[in-house]
Amino acid sequence: MNLRPIARSLLMAAGLCVPGLQAGAGAPAIKRPVVVELYTSQGCSSCLPADALLAKLTKRPDVLPLSLSVTYWDMLGWKDTLASENNTRRQKAYAATMGHGAVYTPQMIVDGTTDVVGSREGQVLSAIDARARDGDTDFVPVAVHETKDELHIGVGASQDRGAVPATVWLFHIKGQATVAIGGGENDGRTMTYHNVVGDLRAVGQWKGDPLTIDLPRAGLEGLPHDSVAVVVQRGGYGHVVGAAMLPHPDFAPER
């Protein structure tokens, strides 16, 4: 399938706490970004180095970093202003898929396959490098752009005809959010978070053949974001085979 022309898009084919967007422009078109998800919390003091590392990763054109704040540390006395149950459920789904007995923060999940303590920069960077090499063998082209009435998502064909079906995820991202924290382990700090996931949803299933998904813009307006990202992921929470980001679509709220 020939995808429609891409307008204003990036086409990229290509201690712990344990409880009881900016993807840069200019990446080569034959590559895709490595998706890095940070599970974090405003109530977790151990998360601060991981939050800082994620901010650094937003400067890399070969990485699509996402910050997902979870809810389970709200019990420490500060309700995380960026957290959502969707984020918490996603992390728990990863834990079940990976066979982990518990969730924790800060956790970075690299391309849906590798679980790394988010504050261990060397391990995180090594995991990114490994997926950048391995991902060249199984990537699927993904494009996202907007038209007058729709958000258009295009997913290309797989070379592996026996590939496991994949979920197409849509992430709504706020590039930066500054928060004055008034309780919990980080009481008194003012933190700036980057590539904050304000909403996420599954918008389709990809089974190896070219796929087009058109979402009405009317249903996207007013959501807490200034960018959107599309991630194509084996099963629901398996390895990532494609991703793309659309910064500052017209339907995003005024910044």
Feature roles, as predicted:
Residues 1-11:
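Bacterial N-terminal signal peptides that target proteins for export
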Residues 9-19:
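Bacterial N-terminal signal peptides
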Residues 14, 49-55, 171-177:
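Short N-terminal helix-initiation segments at or just after the protein's N-terminus
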Residues 24-104:
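Active-site-proximal cofactor/substrate-binding loop regions of enzyme domains
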Residues 79-101, 114, 118-255:
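Short, conserved sequence motifs used for protein processing/export or organelle targeting and
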Residues 111:
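Conserved residues at the C-terminal ends of beta-strands
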